[in-house]
Amino acid sequence: MKIIVKIPVWMLLSLFILSPTTETIYTSGLPSLTKYFSIDGCITQITSTLYFLGFAVGILSLGRLSDIYGRRPIVLLGLFIYIVSSIISIFSVNIEMLMIARFIQAFGVSVGSVIGQSMARDSYQGAELSYVYAILSPWLLFIPSLGSYIGGYIIEYSSWHYVFVFFSLIGTILLALYYKILPETNYYIDFSQSSKYFEVFNIIIKDKILWLYAFIIGAFNGIYYGFFIEAPFILIDKMKVLPSFYGKLAFLLSFSAIFGGFLGGYLIKKRQVHDKKVMSIGFIFSLCGCILFVVNAFILEFILVSNGLAISMIFVPMMIHIIGHSLLIPITLRYALEDYAKVTGTAGSIFGAIYYIVIAAVTYCVSKIHGETISNFSLLCLVSSISSVISFYYICILYKKKSIVANEK
């Protein structure tokens, strides 16, 4: 694969963080939206499910277009859609209008994920790509956690409308910046125009390893976003915590992300630990965190404790899980599409659509099990983590079979 330009890591970061930060800022206002529209919390949570579905549609289509027309013009188009939909959201008169606007918003902002990943693969290869993802990983969780902090203050001192005003301003700034300095990284634009989308699609449909990687990424991100969807109702509505204080608590999760990211970078770069072993360590952290989460959640069901202790019992397990998340996801992203170098945009869009559908499914489950306590959500986290471990075990088996077949040839 030929590299024509290496996009700076900071520019990749600015692409990657827009979507998750948009979601975490938004979820801080879910209880406020519930009261404003006089609806059940589970209905408000479905706006996030629709956001992830819109994201899946966006990456499925816009990633393909970036193979044909280049990365740069599609990024600019996506940002324009993001800005317009954010403005529409400000003037939503009912929850249905907001749901539609959120779907469109996600469609536009999906360029940050799918084309950002394509640009990363266009620019870096092999161990260098793993290292870049490991460096980016803590910031991909740190900055969205900061989003909860920002969202909490916006909600506390104004209203949910100003969340979308903020999105509009950020989108406008990024559009102007990218228009001026974003490079084109796709060397295979001409090749992509002659490639057949459905041929790639048919290959991916039969690629069991890619599907399993997509499930793992979707399940782990589903846990992460599901927490931000459910936690505001528990802390702000039930424990009567101020939105700004909730934002500060959510921000604490970022320190686990930073630790996990730097641990991953240290193990890969300094200790030369194999990627698969780093992934296994990530799964161990996740399982430990999710098991502790379930235990603590059921203790809180039957024993009355202070708010401070209850908050610790909710956040500490999630911090442990997020360390595992930071170790696991960057490496998974590197390996998932290593066989699709010449159709990175197309393959990445299909792959991304699959794992965002998984995220949407997990967040939908969160809305269906929404209740007075967090015990149902903790069980969902544990099931998702265990299912991911099983998927990883099956991936290892498939790799061994693949290696045996290759050696026989």
UniProtKB/Swiss-Prot annotation:
One of its GO terms (biological process) is xenobiotic detoxification by transmembrane export across the plasma membrane. The keyword Transmembrane applies. Gene3D superfamilies: Multidrug resistance protein D. This is Uncharacterized transporter RT0591. Keywords: Cell inner membrane, Cell membrane, Membrane, Transmembrane, Transmembrane helix, Transport. Coiled coil: none annotated. Pfam families: MFS_1. It is found in: Cell inner membrane. One of its GO terms (cellular component) is plasma membrane. It comes from the Bacteria. It is a multi-pass membrane protein. The chain crosses the membrane at residues 3-23, 43-63, 73-93, 95-115, 135-155, 162-182, 209-229, 248-268, 283-303, 309-329, 346-366, 379-399. GO terms for molecular function: xenobiotic transmembrane transporter activity. It comes from Rickettsia typhi (strain ATCC VR-144 / Wilmington). The keyword Zinc does not apply. Belongs to the major facilitator superfamily. Bcr/CmlA family.
